[in-house]
């Protein structure tokens, strides 16, 4: 049996329809793209480690140029990388990067899958990565995806050796080879589905002077796209905004990648012209003939001419059991006839007035359990049969003329992302929905069936809500389902300084419907919470309220304790957040996290009455910890940097990557140096090479590829134990560097003026000792500090030693500090 004739299950989840179609996927141009896909029997799987690794040019060429069915599988969602646009970190960042990747993959014309495993932070070595990722389980996931996708060709982005650099990359290359070898063996991972043997395995990441088998030039111009495949791919890469990928313009001309044939079931070769050389995959004759007939009559100004041939192809695909091919024929027919189904939530109040059709409006965006709303399905064909479906048994009442009254069940499934883990230290997610998919399925959808040339053709659309975006433009997104009240407590951990008395804890409430109720804190026995509860009343969805409680732990509190916020309304309770993750140009996703804060009781001292200024950079939660110390903190905006009395602050902190995102900081940097000269303490946290322009009081050099120490347990040597940052108010030893998370630090100096004093030394296994991590210098009457330790990772999780060291760091600015 030819591999192309085997049934391939449709793997598009409902949410795959949430992305608004690109111009190249609509109308006559979209039809031509679909015809290319219908003509190709080949399936390709591209294995990468995390978002933005992909060979975007080759994927675009294969999919949009050759019509191959391309799936990209990413082992992780990039949870622990840097975030250039928001303060989302860990799992929230993974959600954001999933949205970015879906938009990028749409540009390439590819589908997207994920394994269960998480990005645990930058890793320099294969050995460290495999200590964190359970090798056999990652291979199991890759095997499962191979068996579900049934590719003819597997393309590994990485080779599996030191040439790949990053430890995650090396592991991805190695594990892709192991999964390729295991997928066709029914004795291996029998729980991962029926065996499927791909026919070829290639690896990427090669240069012209390396060993290679074939080249792929994505710099070929495609008149259908109006650009080269590489240029089209670059537009997709720009969706990875949180990583700053794809920012450079792709110029016309050759864009060549080199691939090496690692293994083959159809014979090896020194040189090839295509990934599909020597493959005999073919489509049923009736299907191929129908596609050829549709191609023969294709016309941009009369795309409907191909409909009879497409209907014949649809019939042939169904007869052959090729469900995926049948779905492509249905898409082609819809494109040829200009058919589009929309299924929209109607506004609560009818739109009236002469210009009502020109005014943007919003509708209910999130349905709460038991909520009733009205919706309309339209396709523009009177002969269409429309059905409304859901996963959870929504009540559906037809009101005629495509209008429906819908009621969400009391136990409606939440639209929060369906991959979750108990802790950011867990290496794997559990899936509570479609395994390995990018986003959860839509809550409700409509299907419209029409008859074309004797064949039923079905279109599908999720129920969408209308909203107004950041540019005041009306847009749509699938209706979400969530609780009536979202409850959150901010940071997952906080510090309580023993002996400091009570503290205020703010509970954030947001309504998803009109609702009245109360909110309380559940704390351990012996803890005092005032008041016992507080009432709230929301008149409509989208209202927010901060409720403050005063929490007093017992004097003998120690270790970690959980404090939980619970909202009660009617007979229901909510003790979790329901928060939107969104960025302009992307879809919307929702995350739900327990409204629990762990409180770490610590013996930690900090200077009294500290006044701290903070220059926020790309976004972090360091200010929260400063406030937990009892210090007052102001965020310094452009106006403050330009004209405020900076001498009002004992210490000023510059946030992560601030010199990359705050041009006002660069413009007013001299004022900060004058602040130091007059007695202030300025602490600059890790910054990217934009900082490599001598913004300090004395020269330094970072280079465009600065060093970092990624092993969070790498040994640390204190070089200047007598320095005041180590002597008080907390006595710091090397033990305070134990139990750090994810990494030590990033973006170290490689050279510096002798007036800077290096304070610590550290290195990963195999790395030269690094002393450019933490530099301090006297300047005039003050002190200038560059500290590239990963405070933005340690402090939100209240890592004890990091908290103690940071308390000393900000206390350097105290008027009575020992160094003054």
Question: What are these language model-derived features?
Answer:
Residues 13-15:
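N-terminal signal peptide c-region/cleavage motif recognized by signal peptidases
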Residues 18-45, 125-129, 135-344:
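Metal-dependent de-N-acetylase/amidase catalytic core
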Residues 19-148, 170, 177-181:
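Active-site rim/loop-helix segments in enzyme catalytic domains that contact anionic ligands
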Residues 328-346, 354-355, 476-485:
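Proline/serine/threonine-rich low-complexity linkers at boundaries of modular beta-sandwich domains
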Residues 355-602, 606-608:
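Long beta-sheet-rich domains in secretory-pathway and surface-associated proteins
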Residues 573-655, 688, 709, 793, ...:
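Aromatic-Pro/Gly-enriched surface loop or interdomain linker
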Residues 657-738:
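A glycine-rich, often tryptophan-bearing local segment used as a flexible ligand/cofactor-contacting loop or short
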Residues 704-798, 817:
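Catalytic beta-strand/loop cores that center a nucleophilic Ser/Cys/Thr
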């Amino acid at each position: 049996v030819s591999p192309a004739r085997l049934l391939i299950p449709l793997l598009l989840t409902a949410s795959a329809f949430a992305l608004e179609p690109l111009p190249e996927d609509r109308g006559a141009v979209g039809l031509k793209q679909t015809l290319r896909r219908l003509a190709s029997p080949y399936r390709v799987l591209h294995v990468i480690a995390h978002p933005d690794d992909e060979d975007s040019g080759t994927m675009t060429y294969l999919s949009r140029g050759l019509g191959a069915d391309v799936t990209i599988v990413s082992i992780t969602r990039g949870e622990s990388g840097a975030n250039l646009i928001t303060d989302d970190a860990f799992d929230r960042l993974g959600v954001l990067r999933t949205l970015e990747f879906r938009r990028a993959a749409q540009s390439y014309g590819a589908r997207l899958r994920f394994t269960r495993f998480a990005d645990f932070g930058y890793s320099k070595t294969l050995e460290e990565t495999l200590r964190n990722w359970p090798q056999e389980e990652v291979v199991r996931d890759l095997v499962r995806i191979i068996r579900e996708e049934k590719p003819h060709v597997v393309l590994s982005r990485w080779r599996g050796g030191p040439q790949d650099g990053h430890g995650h990359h090396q592991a991805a290359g190695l594990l892709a080879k192991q999964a390729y070898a295991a997928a066709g063996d029914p004795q291996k991972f029998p729980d991962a589905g029926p065996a499927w043997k791909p026919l070829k395995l290639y690896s990427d990441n090669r240069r012209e002077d390396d060993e290679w088998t074939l080249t792929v030039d994505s710099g070929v111009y495609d008149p259908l796209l109006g650009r080269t495949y590489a240029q089209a791919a670059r537009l997709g890469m720009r969706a990875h905004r949180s990583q700053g990928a794809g920012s450079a313009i792709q110029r016309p001309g050759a864009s060549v990648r080199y691939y090496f044939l690692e293994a083959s079931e159809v014979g090896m070769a020194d040189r090839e012209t295509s990934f599909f050389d020597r493959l005999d995959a073919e489509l049923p004759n009736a299907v191929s003939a129908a596609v050829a007939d549709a191609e023969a009559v294709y016309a941009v100004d009369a795309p409907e001419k191909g409909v009879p041939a497409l209907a014949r192809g649809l019939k042939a695909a169904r007869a052959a059991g090729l469900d995926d091919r049948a779905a492509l024929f249905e898409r082609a027919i819809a494109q040829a006839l200009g058919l589009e189904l929309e299924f929209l939530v109607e506004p609560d109040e009818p739109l009236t007035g002469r210009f009502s059709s020109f005014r943007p409006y919003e509708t209910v965006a999130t349905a709460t359990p038991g909520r009733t709303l009205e919706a309309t399905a339209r396709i523009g064909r009177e002969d269409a049969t429309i059905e409304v479906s859901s996963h959870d048994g929504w009540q559906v009442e037809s009101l005629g003329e495509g209008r429906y009254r819908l009621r969400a069940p009391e136990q409606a499934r939440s639209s929060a992302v369906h991959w979750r883990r108990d802790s950011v230290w867990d290496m794997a997610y559990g899936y509570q929905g479609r395994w390995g998919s990018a986003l959860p399925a839509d809550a409700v959808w409509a299907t419209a069936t029409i008859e074309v040339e004797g064949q039923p053709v079905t279109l599908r659309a999720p129920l969408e809500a209308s909203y107004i975006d950041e540019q005041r433009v009306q847009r749509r997104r699938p209706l979400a389902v969530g609780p009536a009240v979202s409850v959150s407590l901010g940071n997952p951990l906080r510090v309580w300084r023993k002996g400091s008395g009570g503290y205020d804890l703010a509970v954030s409430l947001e309504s998803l419907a009109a609702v009245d109720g109360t909110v309380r804190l559940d704390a351990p026995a012996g803890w005092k919470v005032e008041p016992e509860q507080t009432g709230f009343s929301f008149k409509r969805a989208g209202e927010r309220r901060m409720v403050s409680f005063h929490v007093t732990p017992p004097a003998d509190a120690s270790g970690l304790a959980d404090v939980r916020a619970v909202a009660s309304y009617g007979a229901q309770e909510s003790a979790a957040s329901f928060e939107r993750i969104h960025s302009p140009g992307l879809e919307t996703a929702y995350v739900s996290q327990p409204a629990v804060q762990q409180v770490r009781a610590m013996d930690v001292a900090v200077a009294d009455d500290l006044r701290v200024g903070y220059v926020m950079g790309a976004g972090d939660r360091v200010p929260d910890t400063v406030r937990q110390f009892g210090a007052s903190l102001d965020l310094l905006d452009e106006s403050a940097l330009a004209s405020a009395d900076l001498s009002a602050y004992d210490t000023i902190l510059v946030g992560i990557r601030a010199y990359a995102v705050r041009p006002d900081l660069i413009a007013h940097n001299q004022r900060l140096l004058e602040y130091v000269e007059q007695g202030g303490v300025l602490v600059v946290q890790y910054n990217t090479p934009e900082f490599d322009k001598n913004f300090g009081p004395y020269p330094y050099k970072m280079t465009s590829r600065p060093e970092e120490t990624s092993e969070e347990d790498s040994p640390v040597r204190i070089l200047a134990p007598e320095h005041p940052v180590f002597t008080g108010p907390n006595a710091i030893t090397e033990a305070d560097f134990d139990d750090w998370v994810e990494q030590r630090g990033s973006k170290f100096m490689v050279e510096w003026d002798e007036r800077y004093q290096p304070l610590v030394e550290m290195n990963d296994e195999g790395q030269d000792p690094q002393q450019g991590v933490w530099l301090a210098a006297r300047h005039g009457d003050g002190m200038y500090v560059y500290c590239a330790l990963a405070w933005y990772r340690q402090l939100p999780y209240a890592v004890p030693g990091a908290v103690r060291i940071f308390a000393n760091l900000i206390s350097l600015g105290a008027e009575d500090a020992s160094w003054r």
